[in-house]
UniProtKB/Swiss-Prot annotation:
Protein source organism: Calycanthus floridus
Segments passing through the bilayer: 5-27
Signal peptide as annotated in the record: none
Keywords of this entry: Chloroplast, Membrane, Plastid, Thylakoid, Transmembrane, Transmembrane helix
Designated name of the protein: Protein PsbN
Length: 43
C-alpha cells in the first residue's frame, strides 16, 4: 500500500476510537461519576 493510504487509515481509526471512547464516557458506565453543575446550583 502507499504511505498516504496507511496514514489516512490510521488517522481515521484514531478518530473513530476517540469518538467511541468519548461517547462511552459521556453516556456509558463512567457517566454515573460525572457531576452536574446545573444540578448543584440551586436558585
Amino acid at each position: 500500500m502507499e504511505t498516504a493510504t496507511l496514514v489516512x487509515i490510521s488517522i481515521s481509526g484514531s478518530l473513530v476510537s476517540f469518538t467511541g471512547y468519548a461517547l462511552y464516557t459521556a453516556f456509558g458506565q463512567p457517566s454515573q461519576q460525572l457531576r452536574d453543575p446545573f444540578e448543584e446550583h440551586g436558585d
